[in-house]
UniProtKB/Swiss-Prot annotation:
Primary localization: nucleus
Species whose genome carries this gene: Arabidopsis thaliana
Domain bZIP: 372-435
GO process annotations (BP): abscisic acid-activated signaling pathway; positive regulation of DNA-templated transcription; response to abscisic acid; response to salt stress; response to water deprivation
Name of this protein: ABSCISIC ACID-INSENSITIVE 5-like protein 6
Phenotype of the disrupted gene, per the record: Defective in ABA and stress responses.
């Protein structure tokens, strides 16, 4: 391959020699095991495991899937490449095996492939397994999905359908569908600018020479380049700005759905994990309730701060987005008065600050009298209870004083008796000492005793 680019292929207008590659789009999934059902995967890769996939937890299932995917990709390294090329434009579609699982590479240029986009599935690090289901068994996750489907079918049918519908079994579901519904795969929105228009990196060329066209079947729901300078122009959005606001809302909501319907089925079949389609909006979008006239909501242009002062009444609420300049007008359902009948004073009054009121009910005279009477009764009761407590305290004090007086008298009597008893004992001890010798007693005489035999 050379190093030159074929600039002749970048022409405005759709080339008649470009073939439709709609038949080669399923090549992105023919080398992936994610398109197999559980039964096919069990029959093909479950022989060496010796364990049913339904009894495994989600961690083991992912490990087995990635092991099978790696072995499958290693077997596909020698797969020959199939080229679908355009003679004049130089657009080449290459489908091959290798580590790029179900890869799809697209080359642009006459002799050199200067741009390649991979539609392959990323490796194991891209799949984030939630902690809530990492240790759950596959059968348990499948039962939860079936319960959600039953609840959804009951809500849609309203419980009126009496015909039992056949439920899909786990063996009939593909690995891709199971992982998406179980929440293992997180789809990220793809930016519009990455696939909107590709002109080879040169200014002044149209969008027909690149990949950002709907004619070659690679990019769906992309606008055509009408300016010739690589900038996508949405003619429908330009015309929608001049229409009334009531007619603009259904157009902005329904138009992306009408464009997505022809290509949505093809995209869901060609990719293992389809990306979400990003809807491009205009610079300023006004969404108004259909029940109100368009004169109530004024268009808000994005400014430095993104906020403009607009007249507002009690039934209109405007919110301005700082990035896209989106104006949302919400109308209160409680008031259906026409804006023509609304007086100007009401609009001026709505701009004034709302007083800080809690809506207290004014009390009447009877209520006040009842409150005063209740307070007086409470005061009387408090006084009576205080008087009773004081009387009890006084009586208790008097009883204590009487007991103290009695104890004092008894103490005095006991002290007197003690003094008398002590005097008597003292007198009894002193009486023998007061009597003289010879008086009242006989004098003893000495006598000679025999002390020997003579």
């Amino acid at each position: 391959m050379g190093s030159r680019l074929n600039f002749k292929s970048f022409v405005d207008g759709v080339s008649e020699q470009q073939p439709t590659v709609g038949t080669s789009l399923p090549l992105t999934r023919q080398n992936s095991v994610f398109s197999l059902t559980f039964d096919e995967f069990q029959n093909s890769w479950g022989g060496g495991i010796g364990k049913d996939f339904g009894s495994m937890n989600m961690d083991e299932l992912l490990k087995n899937i990635w092991t099978a995917e790696e072995s499958h990709s290693m077997m596909g390294n020698n797969t020959s490449y199939t080229n679908i090329s355009n003679g004049n434009s130089g657009n080449t579609v290459i489908n091959g095996g290798g580590n790029n699982i179900g890869g799809l590479a697209v080359g642009v240029g006459g002799e050199s492939g200067g741009f390649f986009t991979g539609g392959s599935l990323q490796r194991q690090g891209s799949l984030t397994l939630p902690r809530t289901i990492s240790q759950k068994r596959v059968d348990d996750v499948w039962k939860e999905l079936m319960k959600e489907d039953d609840i959804g079918n009951g809500v849609v049918n309203g419980g009126t359908s009496g015909i039992p519908q056949r439920q899909q079994t786990l063996g009939e579901m593909t690995l891709e569908e199971f992982l998406v519904r179980a929440g293992v795969v997180r789809e990220e929105p793809q930016p519009v600018e990455s696939v909107t228009n590709f002109n080879g990196g040169f200014y002044g060329f149209g969008s027909n020479g690149g990949l950002g066209t709907a004619s070659n079947g690679f990019v769906a729901n992309q606008p055509q380049d009408l300016s010739g300078n690589g900038v996508a122009v949405r003619q429908d959005l330009l015309t929608a700005q001049t229409q009334p606001l009531q007619m603009q809302q259904p157009q902005m909501v329904q138009q992306p759905q009408m464009v997505q319907q022809p290509q949505q089925l093809i995209q869901t079949q060609e990719r293992p994990f389809p990306k979400q389609t990003t809807i491009a909006f205009s610079n300023t979008v006004d969404v108004v309730n259909r029940s109100q006239p368009a004169t109530q909501c004024q268009e808000v242009k994005p400014s430095i701060l993104g906020i403009h002062n607009h007249p507002m009444n009690n039934n209109l609420l405007q919110a301005v987005d700082f990035k896209t300049g989106v104006t949302v007008a919400a109308v209160s359902p409680g008031s259906q008065m026409s804006p023509d009948l609304t007086p100007k004073s009401a609009l001026d009054a709505s701009l004034s600050p709302v007083p800080y009121m809690f809506g207290r009910v004014r009390k009447t005279g009877a209520v006040l009298e009842k409150v005063i009477e209740r307070r007086q009764k409470r005061m009387i009761k408090n006084r009576e209870s205080a008087a009773r407590s004081r009387a009890r305290k006084q009586a208790y004090t008097m009883e204590l004083e009487a007991e103290i007086a009695q104890l004092k008298e008894l103490n005095e009597e006991l002290q007197k008796k003690q003094v008398e008893i002590m005097e008597k004992q003292k007198n009894q001890l002193l009486e023998p000492l007061r009597q003289p010798w010879g008086m009242g007693c006989k004098r003893q005489c000495l006598r000679r005793t025999l002390t020997g035999p003579w």
